[in-house]
Amino acid sequence: MIIATTDTIAGKEITKTLGMARGSTIQAKHLGKDIMSGLRSVVGGELTEYSKMLEEAREKAINRMVEDAEKMGADAVVNVRFMTSMVMAGAAEILAYGTAVKIMNR
């Protein structure tokens, strides 16, 4: 499965648009990691616990988007975007979405 943030793929022609593919996950903070991040935010520096959590969440959302596109029979997903929203205190949703398409070589 080709995943692209652009609306075209070099060397490929989009032959059919299948619809929006999407995948999401909701991640909550871990109390122990939250305390460490709180301390780090006071003294400065990267909040590595949150960076890792968000990286894992993005990967889960991408994988779920790909599964959704595969169900539609897609060869690729173009115009891929991410969106983050707070769903409750201490929890965030990561949404990956794009256009599922059929492609062929030029």
UniProtKB/Swiss-Prot annotation:
Q: Where are the transmembrane segments?
A: none
The record's similarity note reads: Belongs to the UPF0145 family.
What is the protein's given name?
UPF0145 protein MA_3383
